[in-house]
Amino acid sequence: DMGNAYGIDIGTSNFKMCCSDKDKILNEKNIIAIANKTELLAFGDEAYEMYEKAPEHIEVSFPVKFGVIADIENMQTLLFNFFNKINEGKKITGSDFYIAVPTDVTEVEKRAFYELVVDSKVKAKNVYVVDKPVADAIGAGLDVTKSKGIMIVNIGAETTEISVLSLGGIVISKAVKIGGNKLDDCIISNVR
């Protein structure tokens, strides 16, 4: 089967994937359930149902922490399983992958996103790394090529990235380790 293009956004809490020839977007919890240390039990939303409820022999974990990949092996398993899910089990190889990565992370952390896809079982033809703020702006229908500055604020589960774009590039981008989870906690503690 001829390869398509896939866009991926790997977040701390959610994994999003879209495909150039389908108009659906896969958006599931970025979480995995492993039984007896080796056996894949569930992934995505199904694994999230088990989070904090599983017996001891089942490990349910999020492989991304603070916006960067903390557990490569489990993240590769998730990537492959989400890829199969969006393709409804059809064998597809030789596709192009565009992966949105945070800007305010180290080169090593950025490279980990690239290598994750390159080394995985999705058998990519090409892997392109796209700065998340630029992807966000384009996705929001903004013209990033203009000289007028655009400010993008991306609030994730554990990080918030604030960026200013101009002339197709990033002028400045800063990430802080506060996101939706922290906001939820603050609301909960104030409501009690």
Q: What residues fall within each predicted segment?
A:
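Nucleotide/phosphate-binding catalytic cleft detector across ATP-hydrolyzing
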Residues: D1-I155, L165-R192
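Short glycine-rich anion-binding loops that position phosphate/pyrophosphate groups of nucleotides
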Residues: E158
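A structural feature that tracks compact, well-ordered secondary-structure segments
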Residues: E161-S163
